[in-house]
Amino acid sequence: MELTKNQVSMTKGVAILFMLLLHLFCTKNYIGLFQPTVMIGDTPLIYYFALFGDCCVAMYCFCSGYGLMSSYDKDTVGYKKNNLMRIFKLYLNFWIILIVFVLIIGPLLGMRNHYPGSFKAFILTLTAIDPAYNGAWWFLTTYILLVLTSPYLNKSIKKYHPIIILGISGIFYFIAYIQRIKGVLQLDLEWLNWLIRQVALYGTSQLPYVVGILFCHYKWYSKLNVFYQKLRFRNAFGISIIILMVIGHGIVQTLFVAPFIGITFICIFNLLYKPLWLEKVFLYFGKHSTNLWLIHMFFYMIYFKELVFAPKYPILIFTWLIILCLISSYVINFFYHPLLRILDHFTKKRIGFENKSYKLESVE
């Protein structure tokens, strides 16, 4: 049994919750921000859970690679056109958020000098060439590049042995990680530094993405599931592995291990038995994951920091941020979904996309 569409969506739901947890509480300078309820020495316990959440991007990359490879196998001929439409839908979603949070809310709060600020910054953000305003938007450019290069990655994975693919991807990841963290290569030309940065971000994101493609192509999850089902205390085993990873990452506090933790967590999470109500919760967050990714930083850091941290205690702060983001997500979708329907009608009428192959779906 391979990963289903619902399982991938649930995984994205967990990933976005990890992202919020990471950005809220992965700091030891908590005084004035929140009141920890449990301490381990001088460090809040919530810090270690938040640190574990740094695998969120790797999880999303894995899901994207897995999903796109599945789409590639189903419709190789129309794959590139589907990808272009997928990217355009993401742009459409992003532009609505850009208008609401940068062009409207920024000036209303008296922050016009920075939101939107200069025309150059706005255009570079609008095109996703070099997004400003929101630190979480860096992944927008990287994701678009991953989607655009996915046909070539898919072909390579079908052609070459997985050990060769993993070796090349691993070396690329290692070099890109050093550049991203240490900034070894710095040049005088702005556009070259931008290019180097994008290559580094792409390089640190492509490893879990490639592993996701490999999982789909070689059906590794099915093989893992066969082994897992033979275990007597399956859930206890899986939860124990997750706890050990949280402890291990608390000892080895480096972003370098994030892809390996993320990939392992995805496998265990989907193998675990979960009650139906819990699956529905994760599916719900999976559907809103794109909006939550693109807007959450406006609340906890840029515009409404004091409001978000007002509840003081981590569980209340976390819940409050989720509520604020979900309300905003519904507002965004109020505009986004009708535009998708208009676009769906236009593309089928003017471009002749087949209804079955090119039916538009929300980017969630």
What label would you give each PLM region?
Residues 45-57, 127-142, 179-211, 244-266, ...:
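Interfacial loop-to-helix transition and helix-capping segments at the boundaries
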Residues 79, 97-105, 122-132, 188-194, ...:
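Short juxtamembrane and helix-loop transition motifs at transmembrane-helix boundaries
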